[in-house]
């Protein structure tokens, strides 16, 4: 059973509040019945339907940090954006806390796209997602599954496939491995 979540209404971010955007707290459900908490950012001068972006990550972080800053900055540039806490994290529901699942986390992005696509002020044909750090891969998973996602940005620090093959700093670059 999904527990009722309580949202902090005061500005609780690690970055200053922009005077160029409106901010509000929203929630939406995933297909797994979990409630995700999100910060919605809308340009103050918004007119008509706007393109939208869902943002999450880095892995283990909450929307009051990096993803919120990205979302607010993109709203200043004319997008409707949401930064959400993944399932089991921050203000979102799910037990046990601080649990990760690629399938559930991919669904988190898809649920964010569902939420955005149903808003009257969003152009549902122009929805993008941004995944930061470990969430870059989750964003790619979501984009591969959902044709409504028209653009995907994966902001990742390094190539984990190279690390898997060669070890950190190519430590396993032995003659036998080659």
Q: Where are each of the predicted segments found?
A:
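The serine-hydrolase catalytic nucleophile loop
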Residues: 60-72, 86
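Alpha/beta-hydrolase fold nucleophile elbow
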Residues: 120-133
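N-terminal cap/lid segment of alpha/beta-hydrolase-fold proteins
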Residues: 2-48
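Conserved alpha/beta-hydrolase
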Residues: 73-93
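Alpha/beta-hydrolase-fold enzymes
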Residues: 138-178
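Short beta-strand element of the alpha/beta-hydrolase
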Residues: 48-58
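Alpha/beta-hydrolase active-site loop
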Residues: 99-120
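Glycine-rich "HGGG/HGxG" loop immediately N-terminal to the catalytic nucleophile
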Residues: 65, 88-100
């Amino acid at each position: 059973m999904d527990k009722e979540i309580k949202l902090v209404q005061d500005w609780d971010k690690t970055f200053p509040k922009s005077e160029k955007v409106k901010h509000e707290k929203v929630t939406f459900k995933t297909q797994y019945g979990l409630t995700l908490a999100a910060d919605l950012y809308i340009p103050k001068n918004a007119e008509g339907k706007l393109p939208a972006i869902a943002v999450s990550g880095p892995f283990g972080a909450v929307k009051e940090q990096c993803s919120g800053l990205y979302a607010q900055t993109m709203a200043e540039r004319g997008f409707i954006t949401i930064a959400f806490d993944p399932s089991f994290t921050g203000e979102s529901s799910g037990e046990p806390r601080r649990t990760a699942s690629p399938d559930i986390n991919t669904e988190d992005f898809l649920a964010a796209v569902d939420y955005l696509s149903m808003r009257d002020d969003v152009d549902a044909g122009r929805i993008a997602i941004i995944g930061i750090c470990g969430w870059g891969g989750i964003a790619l998973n979501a984009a591969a599954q959902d044709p409504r996602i028209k653009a995907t940005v994966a902001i990742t620090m390094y190539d984990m496939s190279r690390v898997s093959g060669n070890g950190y700093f190519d430590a396993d670059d032995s003659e036998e491995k080659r």
